Amino acid sequence: MTLPFKAVAVDMDGTFLDDRKQFDHEQFDQLLTEFEKRGVHFIVASGRPYVRLKQDFKGFADRMDFVTLNGSRLIIKGKDAASYPMNRADVLELLDDVQAKYGKMATMVFQKDIAYLHSEIDKDERDFLAYFAGNSDVIDDWDDLPEDDIYQITFGMDSKHAADVEEAFNKNHENKISAFASATFAIDVNVKGVSKGSGLERLLAKMGMTGNDLIAFGDGGNDIPMLDFAKYSYAMANGMDKVKKHAKFIAPANTENGVFRVLQKYLDEDK
């Protein structure tokens, strides 16, 4: 029997990582080696930026591919493959709009290799978010953001408002946005048309593959487009109920090494 897929895509938080934000490096090395022997690509599809993911996968990153910032920046074996930035003026307006409607909250604005957090937010909250950035700085005024491309905004707010944030902004703007519930209290905003699903579609196309060649694992709202795209889609047992409705299969929880267990089962059957 040969494996039914040629590429693996995994979300990070709540999926590939356990609740301590860790994974078994030795086990992963063995898994990755087996996939390399079979010509299978291992892809991380995350709302995290590449600068953070390189730290997460130190010693492995050059053997992998990445769909970062929910599909805004694509990396193949350490090299930029494509990127899809937001409109700067729209970003600044959205930051004002959301704060005016929902009040002050922890917010991150992601550029290529750095994320910015506003100084008026409590330091403990900033430090928590900074972990996900990998490289961050504090800014006093969003208007002072460097002129570099902006790829994502993450709002630390109840994710039930994601659809409202998207709808309210898109109603009055030509340059549209997409808003995803990335966690219970986090909303990621990207340029319209960008998602983990579109990112994987574009990445796989560069390799001569489609969603029919993909197995994917996720737990959060921003994983739904990826699960819809993949022929072999797994929601984690610990995932959101709405996410499970978009998956063909359920994997054991992230705390039970769910991704590894499912993938190892496929490898064990490929003898």
Which stretches of residues belong to each language-model region?
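Mg2+-dependent phosphoryl-transfer enzymes with acidic/Ser/Thr/Gly-rich catalytic loops
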Residues: 2-7, 25, 188-271
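Asp-based phosphoryl-transfer active-site loop
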Residues: 4-21
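Active-site phosphate-binding/coordination module
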Residues: 23-125
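Alpha-helical scaffold elements within enzyme catalytic domains, especially in hydrolases
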Residues: 34, 97-99, 168-171, 242
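Short active-site oxyanion
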Residues: 39-43, 62-64, 152, 212-214, ...
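Short, structured coil segments at secondary-structure junctions
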Residues: 60-62, 70, 173-175, 229-230, ...
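Short hydrophobic/aromatic-enriched beta-strand-loop microsegments
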Residues: 63-69, 84, 129, 233-237, ...
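Conserved acidic, metal-coordinating active-site core of Asp-based
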Residues: 104-217, 221-229, 238
